[in-house]
């Protein structure tokens, strides 16, 4: 593993409260669950953990509450090779929470309270201007306030820091933001939201990628689930297949892919090789339960790839 440029991740931190039960309660009904766990999540934190465990030189800009969960999350992130200096503790606020019910068929219903995530303001981003300006890449998602994502993208763009955006959860985005993005990684749903093109095959993916190229984005990677990734650089596209594994839990597959992908690109791996590295990380993650507990370490990814040769 060669020395690589530095990465800044900006995003969300949640505590996931997960209750498994046979069937969802109807209004007014109380249902007994069969398994409960608290796991750390949030798209930003998941991607930061994936990058840290993949070997990136990474700092994380985020917010937690001044509660015990926030303290536990910060301690855990520090053990994942992440510089948590830019993680702000918001007085009087709770750490972000996701309440997740999972039924016997594996379906889920989720309610989220942003908590301290909503306090990740443009002012807090501005306080990290030098860190963003000096980084090789900035990786963001859409669980943070959009004005803060925009502020960080502007700083990065002005200083030739690569801007990578995972546009999740799916939403429409202003062209002003998209014009600042160098690498975008939507799934099919997110690509349709951004382009108006339903992505059902490689031809659709190529059309959607072209729309995003026309908005100023050089590298478009549309994730296609088990079919892999449609990778398009300035209109030159190809599908890079993933690995076949027996999936147990796909909760953090996309986040693992994104964190590992940017790590590999910062090591100057060619794009197809970086995607293959990210596919390997995600393939390992889906064979394990939970969000961050499923994210593999670099040694595991390298060993997985060695077995595929």
UniProtKB/Swiss-Prot annotation:
* Record-listed E.C. numbers: 2.7.1.15
The active site lies at 255 (proton acceptor)
Query: Which species is listed as the source?
Result: Escherichia coli (strain K12)
**Signal peptide span:** none
Q: What is its main location?
A: cytoplasm
Q: How is its activity regulated?
A: Activated by a monovalent cation that binds near, but not in, the active site. The most likely occupant of the site in vivo is potassium. Also activated by ammonium ion. Ion binding induces a conformational change that may alter substrate affinity.
Per its UniProt entry, which superkingdom is the organism in? Bacteria
Q: How does activity depend on temperature?
A: Optimum temperature is 30-50 degrees Celsius.
For this record, an example GO cellular component is: cytosol
The reply to whether Acyltransferase figures as a keyword in the UniProt entry is no
Name the UniProt record assigns to this protein:
Ribokinase
Q: Which GO molecular-function terms appear in the entry?
A: ATP binding; metal ion binding; protein homodimerization activity; ribokinase activity
Gene3D superfamilies on file: 3.40.1190.20
> In the UniProt record, does the keyword Cytoplasm occur?
yes
Q: State the compartments where it is located.
A: Cytoplasm
What SUPFAM superfamilies does its record include? Ribokinase-like
Subunit and interaction comment: Homodimer.
Q: What is the primary gene name for this protein?
A: rbsK
Q: Which reaction(s) does its UniProt entry say it catalyses?
A: D-ribose + ATP = D-ribose 5-phosphate + ADP + H(+)
Residues engaged in binding K(+): 249, 251, 285, 288, 290, 294
